[in-house]
Structures are given as structure tokens and as C-alpha cells.
Amino acid sequence: MLTSFDESYIATAFKQNVHQLYQCAEGWLGATCEYGTLHIDEEQYFLEKEWIDKERFIPVITALNRYVQPLVRYRMDDILVLKTKPCLCGSAMTAVEKISGRCEDTLYFPSKDQALRPVYADHIHQALRVVSGNVHQYQLIQYSVHRLVVKIQASNFLQAIECIEQQFEKLFFSHGLKRPLLEFVPMEALPLNQTFRRTQRLSKCT
């Protein structure tokens, strides 16, 4: 699935609505309907929700109708946000508001009481949408709870740094978190044999 940052970029470039498939190495899991809402294919999978908070959950799926690779309570690494209102398409299958990101890519920072709190990838994407006109690509790498490297590809590098710092200041303040050291570096072209991950947590924060 695309991040909101990438979806907006593609929709603007092609002047079309973007519809998506939700799948992983285990196969097809769902797709967006005509209204753009992602639905889990519960005709093929039995879905259990491992709740993280009141709106986010980790999907645990079971599929016994698969002979080659049956899945029994397979815990995925994705974090989904449940859609609170019924979708206009009328489907009874679970509707997902958005994908917050992957568990392994959730960033953690200390709060004022020193407890580590999560910052999900979608929070970061939403904060940086403001600078999407100048920033063409970015990547965040967390080396520790006090150090965050921000790689950016931008039309105006210095202006992008200033805008991103302002957005991060708002983000950490709204979450009641201590602001880490931000290190900005130009983003180099990614080798074609590497998978691009926009958010990476290299430190063992949890």
C-alpha cells in the first residue's frame, strides 16, 4: 500500500483517483472499493484484531482453504486503523481507514516522564505533507531515541530543512515528546537491488 504522501503525489501527477491492492508475501488480503476505502477480504480470511489502542490494531489472519500454504493465526507486521463509520459501498467486510505503517518501523521517543512513546509512520507522513511541494523524497532513520537522521531530496535543500524542523517541532510537542537531534543529509539514489523503506528504526528502543 502507498503512503498518503506517495498516493497524493501519484494522484496529482496523473490527475486520477488511486485505487490500491493490499497484499504481502502470503498473497492477496484486500483492496479499495469504488469509494477508495480499503476492505479486508474476509471471504478468504478469518480476521482477528490485536488492539494496540482504541483505533489501531495488528491483523492476525487465518486461511484454512489454502492447501499449499495454510495460515493459522498469522500475525502480520502491519498496523491498521479501523474505519469508525460504515463505508458507503455497503460492504460488511472490515473497512480500514489507513495503514499506520509497520510495527518494525514505528519510531519511539521519550516523553517528559522518560517513558518511550510510539510515533507511527502515518503521523510523520501527515506532518510532512505540508512540505511535499518542495520535498520530492525523504527517508527517516532512527539510530537512537535521541538521534534521527533525515534524508531528503528537495528543490531547495535549506528551505526544506527549515520547514521540516518546524513540522517536527509541532509533531513532538503535540505528542508530549522530547525532540531528538535531527541530522539532515541529502538523499542519494537508492540501488535498484535494495527495498526502499521510508521509515527505519535501527535502535532497539522497545
Language-model features: where?
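Active-site glycine/GP-rich loop and adjacent strand/helix microenvironment
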Residues: 1-206
